[in-house]
From Swiss-Prot:
Belongs to the GcvH family. Binds 1 lipoyl cofactor covalently. GO terms for biological process: glycine decarboxylation via glycine cleavage system. The glycine cleavage system catalyzes the degradation of glycine. The H protein shuttles the methylamine group of glycine from the P protein to the T protein. The modification N6-lipoyllysine is found at residue 64. It comes from Rubrobacter xylanophilus (strain DSM 9941 / JCM 11954 / NBRC 16129 / PRD-1). The glycine cleavage system is composed of four proteins: P, T, L and H. Residues 23-105 form the Lipoyl-binding domain. One of its GO terms (cellular component) is glycine cleavage complex. Keywords: Lipoyl. Its cofactor is (R)-lipoate. This is Glycine cleavage system H protein. InterPro entries: 2-oxoA_DH_lipoyl-BS (IPR003016), Biotin_lipoyl (IPR000089), GCV_H (IPR002930), GCV_H/Fam206 (IPR033753), GCV_H_sub (IPR017453), Single_hybrid_motif (IPR011053).
Length: 126
């Protein structure tokens, strides 16, 4: 079973958000990185650009496939994880830590899945 940290909220498309006040850190879930396989490239938006909940904000490329990344939150990108340019494997090695993708200043309250709701969704997919 994939790791599902209890301090995060989740999307149906396997992204997570760590909400801290009016900001969020965003990444993909352990389940998503397992399904993708070895990540070889991540394309992220520019700092200062806007992201919209449920809309694509970049792509992630693995040895198996290229997939869109969907934002769990709406707001302005304040930081991107530039270390992924040189070390995209961090997404596989530590998806909830060093493999984070971007930080966003929230423009609205996100409507996301609790850890329990996300776990049930994974069980339904199996």
């Amino acid at each position: 079973m994939a790791e599902i940290p209890q301090d995060l909220v989740y999307t149906r498309t396997h992204e997570w958000a760590r909400i801290e006040g009016d900001a969020a850190t965003v990444g993909i879930t352990d389940h998503a990185q397992e399904e993708l396989g070895d990540v070889v490239f991540v394309e992220l938006p520019e700092v200062g650009s806007s992201v919209q909940a449920g809309e694509p904000f970049g792509t992630i490329e693995s040895v198996k496939a290229v997939s869109d990344l969907y934002s769990p939150v709406s707001g302005e990108v304040t930081e991107v994880n530039t270390s992924l340019e040189e070390s995209p494997e961090k997404v596989n090695e530590d998806p909830y830590g060093e493999g984070w993708l971007l930080r966003v200043r929230l423009s609205e309250e996100p409507d996301l899945l609790s850890p329990e709701e996300y776990a049930r969704r994974l069980e339904e997919e199996e």
